[in-house]
Amino acid sequence: MNMPRSLWLLVIGMMINVTGSSFLWPLNTIYIHEHLDKSLTVAGIVLMLNAAASVIGNLVGGVLFDKIGGFKSILLGIVITLVAVITLVFFHGWPVYIYLLILIGLGSGIVFPATYALAGTVWPEGGRKAFNAIYVAQNVGVAAGASLGGLVASISFHYIFIANAGLYAVFFLIAYFGYRNIDAKRASQTSILDQKPAVKNSQKFTALVILCIGYLLCWVGYVQWPSTISSHTQSLNIPLNQYSLLWTVNGALIVCAQPILSQFVKYVAKTLKQQMIIGFFLFIVSFVVASYAEQFTGFLLAMVILTIGEMLVWPAVPTIADDLAPKGRQGFYQGFVNSTATGGRMIGPLLGGMIADYYNMNLLFIIIISLLIFGIFTTLIYDKRLKATIELGTVPNQ
């Protein structure tokens, strides 16, 4: 891919950033529940606070990008995160762990929107390819970080914190020396906070809201994997390194299966709605398989099915939002989509933790499957009230 050097720097930085965070995030629930001896409900609350801090970070990052540019915004986010992860090396007991996770959420939240905004400005002629490159880099980081994290955690969780801090230090150096001369062209960028949502009576916005209800429910289900399901695998005596391998498979499949996916959406699921319906169905099948799984192979099969569903749903929603957005409101619509995803990440661990704590995993699986079925319904009807038929294309090759 003939990308400019500045975009390659952003891609490499994002990959290292996500690799560092992926050392820790799939294991957060296990660490809080097994090592800090807290309930799954408490673990869910902690993850919810981390996600809430990320929401604030995203909004702050958007404002900062407009005010001071991408370089300073990213650097500030990295510094906040780096201070937190270095402190985590020395202090990772209760309740300090909560405060540091909140700081990590805030810092990383600032980094992501600024990175995406920079990617669009350094290679405007690349169109979606610039964002796809960042997306693939994230998944390479997830695969590498989750795999290595499980191996390191099986030796000692303390080494997880050290590795995390080391990778963020490398990310800081790349950003400090590599991003300084990247022209952010910030005058052409807008922040979600500057977008006035004067869309109350818009049929298109109503369609987006209905669509995002299903998207939120999908995320509520998805985040059970790094929260309640991770703890569930421990109760079944599945080793940590095997659980972490599930996320390696997830990231590797997303990266390697893009050519197959592009052919599938070209010849089978030709519209975005079809892709989402099939994706939701695969999510349901994945949770059915996981509900019966007692060995690693069962969870591996469930993860493969889940990942294929994710590859269909995740790119489709922002693409539909872009198609629905009136001119000049693209930022607001995309911000709404991102907020919905974060909302699912906030609600999911807490809801799942409470159900697993007070009832059992079987009931949790039933509830998640029911929510996903409702998500199919909202996806089917989201555009019914639009005055004109909106022609939806397929997800671009990634």
Language model features with spans:
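Helix-loop boundary and gating motifs at the non-cytosolic
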Residues: 3-51, 207-247
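Residue-level signature of mid-helix packing/kink "hotspots" within the transmembrane helices
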Residues: 51-59, 142-143, 251-259, 345-346
